[in-house]
Every structure is written in structure tokens, then in C-alpha cells.
A protein has these predicted regions:
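Bacterial Sec-dependent N-terminal signal peptides
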Residues: 1-22
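Extracellular glycan-recognition regions
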Residues: 21-128
């Protein structure tokens, strides 16, 4: 069985973020309560404390953050612009390439101790 890669915008914590690219053709996994598409940009308010981690060294698994995605097969390019109202420790927003709940890569900007950091997590059965 050929696996398809799901590429989308994974958005965590309480952020507003934007993205312009065929937004109307994408779909939600864990749809947030408040969101809109306007002027080719996605704006959302995300449930606090939501995230993507699988059997991490912290001892927990979560798969509950909003994820706006499209399904692709073969090669593709993704270009996104991410902005957010980062306020709380670990607020983050970015891009996730996902095959299923056990196999994904998420990368983005994470706010930790008053500083912005580039963050990447690779999950293959467990998150690194």
C-alpha cells in the first residue's frame, strides 16, 4: 500500500497564524473553535496546551493541536509564512509533514523563556 504524505500547517498553543496557498482545498484535523480565511490568509485561535508528541521522554502522548492540511503523493514544494502572537512558554506554530499518528515531522517557531527558537521534532513510533 502506497503511503501518502499529509503536509499542512500544524499550529499549537494560543496563536494566530497565517498561510496563503489554496486554503479552501485544505481540511482540518482537530479543527479549532475560531478560525477564518480572509485575503488568502488563515487566522486561528488555538486551544491552549494542545500539541503533537508521541511517547516522548516526558512520558506523555498528545495528538490534539489544530492541523490544517492537504494530502499529496510524490514530490511537492511547500512555502508558508508563519506569524503569531506568542505570549506563553512553548507557544509554537509551523509546518508538519505527517503520514499518520506514529510518523511525522513538525518544525516551526517556538517561544521559550522569552526567546524565539527554531524547533523540530521527528516522530517514528516515538517522538525524539
Amino acid at each position: 500500500m502506497k503511503k501518502q504524505l499529509i503536509a499542512g500547517m500544524a499550529l499549537w498553543a494560543s496563536l494566530q497564524c497565517g498561510m496563503a496557498q489554496s486554503l479552501e482545498k485544505m481540511q482540518w484535523f482537530n479543527e479549532p473553535e475560531q478560525w477564518k480565511i480572509e485575503n488568502q490568509a488563515l487566522t486561528m485561535y488555538v486551544t491552549p496546551q494542545s500539541d503533537y508528541w508521541r511517547i516522548s521522554h516526558y512520558g506523555f502522548t498528545v495528538d490534539d493541536a489544530p492541523f490544517y492540511y492537504a494530502t499529496y503523493g510524490g514530490e511537492f514544494e511547500v512555502k508558508v509564512k508563519v506569524t503569531g502572537d506568542y505570549k506563553t512558554r512553548f507557544d509554537q506554530a509551523g509546518l508538519m509533514l505527517r503520514i499518520d499518528h506514529e510518523n511525522y515531522i513538525k518544525t516551526g517557531i517556538e517561544f521559550v523563556d522569552g526567546k524565539f527558537n527554531l524547533s523540530t521534532v521527528v516522530t517514528h513510533k516515538t517522538s525524539d
